[in-house]
């Protein structure tokens, strides 16, 4: 069994990497990938905490996080396709120009 501190440190590192990618990148695809990393880091923290205390709640929250990530990915990819069709780019700065 993985100690609680090691699992939470790994989850924090993954969350920080995802947040860094989300803030630095301007490409919508990379931003979606970074957001997926952040969601998976939070789900990992739930699973680690649940396994330490012998509860199944962490695994239930993981299933909820995976379903949330699937919904987020489908909506994000639909927006990505529309942005690529209309502007022929994936730069997030052009989204503000799509109003209208």
Curated annotation (Swiss-Prot):
GO biological process, one term: ATP synthesis coupled electron transport
Catalytic activities: a quinone + NADH + 5 H(+)(in) = a quinol + NAD(+) + 4 H(+)(out)
Membrane topology, record value: Multi-pass membrane protein
Annotated localization: Cell inner membrane
Residue stretches spanning the membrane: 4-24, 28-48, 60-80
One GO cellular component, as annotated: plasma membrane
InterPro entries reported in the protein's UniProt record: NADH_UbQ_OxRdtase_chain4L/K, NUOK/Mnh_C1-like
Enzyme Commission code: 7.1.1.-
UniProtKB keywords: Cell inner membrane, Cell membrane, Membrane, NAD, Quinone, Translocase, Transmembrane, Transmembrane helix, Transport, Ubiquinone
Pfam family, one: Oxidored_q2
Classification via Gene3D superfamilies: 1.10.287.3510
One GO MF term: quinone binding
Enzyme class: translocase
Function: NDH-1 shuttles electrons from NADH, via FMN and iron-sulfur (Fe-S) centers, to quinones in the respiratory chain. The immediate electron acceptor for the enzyme in this species is believed to be ubiquinone. Couples the redox reaction to proton translocation (for every two electrons transferred, four hydrogen ions are translocated across the cytoplasmic membrane), and thus conserves the redox energy in a proton gradient.
Family indicated by similarity: Belongs to the complex I subunit 4L family.
Subunit composition and interactions: NDH-1 is composed of 13 different subunits. Subunits NuoA, H, J, K, L, M, N constitute the membrane sector of the complex.
PANTHER family: NADH-UBIQUINONE OXIDOREDUCTASE CHAIN 4L, NADH-UBIQUINONE OXIDOREDUCTASE SUBUNIT ND4L
The protein's name in its UniProt record: NADH-quinone oxidoreductase subunit K
Organism of this sequence: Edwardsiella ictaluri (strain 93-146)
Top-level taxonomy: Bacteria, Pseudomonadati, Pseudomonadota, Gammaproteobacteria, Enterobacterales
């Amino acid at each position: 069994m993985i100690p609680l501190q090691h699992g939470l440190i790994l989850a924090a590192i993954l969350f920080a990497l995802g947040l860094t990618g989300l803030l630095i990148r301007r490409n919508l695809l990379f931003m979606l990938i970074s957001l997926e990393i952040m969601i998976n880091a939070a789900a990992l923290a739930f699973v680690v905490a649940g396994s330490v205390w012998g509860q199944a709640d962490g695994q239930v929250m993981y299933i909820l996080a995976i379903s949330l990530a699937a919904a987020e990915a489908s909506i994000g990819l639909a927006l990505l396709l529309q942005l690529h069709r209309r502007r022929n780019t994936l730069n997030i700065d052009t989204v503000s120009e799509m109003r209208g």
